[in-house]
């Protein structure tokens, strides 16, 4: 399973630049562990991510917080200026089947064309335990 992850509004409550909520990260960890899922960044944060050398301070903070929960970032989508195209291209490049991914995002407007397995998180709460329960019922 692959989780395509937006950050702002999913791992925080849109409370300012580059803020991360431990509760939201714990909920993501629970979801990833139950589904044996890898994380692929779709967030604009991904532009600061690199496998070689040091990433941006925000990504380093994210990697540290994820690591504390036993999670790592497997990859990131390319910058094609269209979230649907970026995710679709990653799915094609990595031969991911329709039943083997979830898209977590808080912004429906990023998805101008229909895409399967999209789950919209309330950006006032970030990812909650109830979201995790709903997703586990749907994808387990």
Give the role of each language-model region.
Residues 2-81:
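Alpha-helical substrate-recognition element adjacent to the catalytic core
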Residues 1-3, 100-101:
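The start of beta-strands in P-loop NTPase/AAA+ ATPase cores
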